[in-house]
């Protein structure tokens, strides 16, 4: 993105494994999401999905961290403290297990997730994705100003 973030999506799509929709339908949904991000000035670098059902007992289905491990390997980036946004408990659990900072958005299923409790430690909560983006950009500006202040010479 313009702000220097790499946006990656990790999504459970058991409907594919159950035969509710095919890969072409899923790709069309993903393209729609990418187009919406692009229209807002963002860019999704990659979309990772798990097509398995819970009974398949795979490593990639959230709340397991398999997709996150794949993302870390593919982008050659450790995920410690990387912000990870989701609206379900399993999103947050997978993020926490991978060492990310779990961020709950109250849009989508987020309000119900908050009501049900059991959030991972240090979960940060925002109203929506826009509020998350604003927070991250503000934090970056503060960190940049702090670095600039620390490198000034008298």
What spans do the regions from the language model cover?
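Intrinsic-disorder-associated, low-complexity terminal segments enriched in Asp/Asn/His/Tyr and depleted
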Residues: 148-150
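Substrate-recognition element of Asp-dependent hydrolases with the DxDx(T/V) motif
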Residues: 1-30, 43-56, 95
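Acidic, Mg2+-coordinating phosphoryl-transfer loop and its flanking beta/alpha structural elements
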Residues: 84-124
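Short glycine/serine/threonine/alanine-rich loop segments
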Residues: 5, 42, 77, 100
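Short, hydrophobic alpha-helical segments
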Residues: 75, 133-143
């Amino acid at each position: 993105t313009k702000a220097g973030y790499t946006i990656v999506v990790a999504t459970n799509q058991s409907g594919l494994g159950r035969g509710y929709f095919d890969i072409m339908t899923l790709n069309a949904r993903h393209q729609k999401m990418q187009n919406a991000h692009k229209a807002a000035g963002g860019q999704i670098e990659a979309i990772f999905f798990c097509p398995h059902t819970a009974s398949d007992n795979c490593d990639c289905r959230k709340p397991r961290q398999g997709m996150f491990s794949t993302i870390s390997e593919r982008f050659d980036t450790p995920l410690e403290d990387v912000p990870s946004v989701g609206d379900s408990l399993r999103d947050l659990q997978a993020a926490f297990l991978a060492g990310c900072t779990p961020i709950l958005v109250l849009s989508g299923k987020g309000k119900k997730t908050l009501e049900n409790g059991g959030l991972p430690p240090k979960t940060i909560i925002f109203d929506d994705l826009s509020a998350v983006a604003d927070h991250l950009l503000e934090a970056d500006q503060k960190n940049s100003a702090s670095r600039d202040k620390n490198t000034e010479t008298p």
